[in-house]
Amino acid sequence: MKTLIELFDESPILNVLASVAFKPEKLIFFGADPLQVEESRGDYNRFFKSRGESPEIEYISADMENIDEVNDTLAKIISENPDCVVDVTGGKDIALLAAGMAAVKLGVPLIAYNRRTKKYANISKYEHAMRANIFGLLDCEDFF
């Protein structure tokens, strides 16, 4: 993996955890609004510099209330960075949805941190589970 696409989260630790583990050459923070970018850019640069690391960092925004724009933007990022992985440990719900759709449609690997095992897992290997048809198996009465 040369490029890590990090779904930008409010929690700084979730934004750097995969980078610390995998040390990508390029880190793309996806989903941060411009104000978040300006507030955090220096912090992340200082963090990586303090660790002796210098990944190329990009911040790419999209309208996080428009699924078509989020999908199109993420698909463009993936096409421009074919050797990429998407970390879905954090991020906004709409970005997580778009990442899942990209995993199925474009074959991009998804990773997520498992707090119980303290390891990252490639969750895109479970494609059959993502396509499972659960309709008809449960109804509202099962929960009451």
Residue ranges and their predicted role:
Residues 1-84, 97-144:
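Long, low-complexity, Lys/Arg-enriched
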